[in-house]
């Protein structure tokens, strides 16, 4: 049984990495068409092998270690970031979800909150002012929006009465939580965009102020691992949006095609938002969470608590 669980987890991680590779191609092609150009189309048929060519290029580059970095933690942080991103995908390993019982969402909260340490370490151990300031911005942004994400998640758990992801999905077989909690769903999506440091909330970097942010000193393998972790988190958040608000179990169907279509649409929304909206201001981003989202989420959560208490007698 343990071997089956282990193999199932490994397969989940490998599939996630393959999805990340082709999601980067989708983003580059999509942004190209948004900007009235073709995007990558020279490698193979319509540019489809482009992610494989990029992987070969990045992983065969020389490992450059800047003079002032703390070498060991500098090299460990990207690997730690990717490891944490892949651990989240174990939630969608059927055997592991069953063995976790009612604690799968608790695992999500714990692992997702650990991601800020790898980002902070990547900037801190680079011993670069640009990288350090970028990591401080990224950590402040992540911690702020984790507050709203946790409270929104609590509202979903309150409606279902369980911390099990499989129970949340089964609960929505007849009615989606998105219909009951539509504004929470919108706030969750915006929080996911901010949590993954995506445009228009990409304040961890900035060409005119922070260069590339916390990954300024990374090249080759380190750069690849950091961005694989970022895109892995984007895809995981897309799956989680469908599971929490649109009853992911309903779409499983034949070979899970319905679920794949819905997740692809949410992933495309991340790209669409990046292509459509200008960069936000950092102070307005913080005002959005602390002065708008937090009071709204707390009010809705209190309303749900009172409603559930009254309905349960």
Curated annotation (Swiss-Prot):
Q: Which reaction does it catalyse?
A: a ubiquinone + NADH + 5 H(+)(in) = a ubiquinol + NAD(+) + 4 H(+)(out)
Q: Please state what class of enzyme this protein is.
A: translocase
Topology term for the membrane:
Multi-pass membrane protein
Q: Where are the transmembrane segments?
A: 6-26, 71-91, 105-125, 149-169, 173-193, 220-242, 255-275, 293-313
Please give the GO cellular component terms listed in this UniProt entry.
Answer: mitochondrial inner membrane
Q: Which residues form a coiled coil?
A: none
Source superkingdom: Eukaryota
State the Gene Ontology terms under molecular function: NADH dehydrogenase (ubiquinone) activity
Q: Name one Pfam family in it.
A: NADHdh
Subcellular location(s): the record lists: Mitochondrion inner membrane
Keywords assigned by UniProt, alphabetized: Electron transport, Membrane, Mitochondrion, Mitochondrion inner membrane, NAD, Respiratory chain, Translocase, Transmembrane, Transmembrane helix, Transport, Ubiquinone
Query: Entry's InterPro entries?
Result: NADH_UbQ_OxRdtase_su1/FPO, NADH_UbQ_OxRdtase_su1_CS
* GO terms (BP aspect): aerobic respiration
For this protein, what is the EC number? 7.1.1.2
Xref: HAMAP family: NDH1_NuoH
**Membership in a protein family:** Belongs to the complex I subunit 1 family.
Functionally, this protein is described as follows: Core subunit of the mitochondrial membrane respiratory chain NADH dehydrogenase (Complex I) that is believed to belong to the minimal assembly required for catalysis. Complex I functions in the transfer of electrons from NADH to the respiratory chain. The immediate electron acceptor for the enzyme is believed to be ubiquinone.
Identify this protein by name: NADH-ubiquinone oxidoreductase chain 1
Recorded source organism is Heterololigo bleekeri
Its gene is ND1
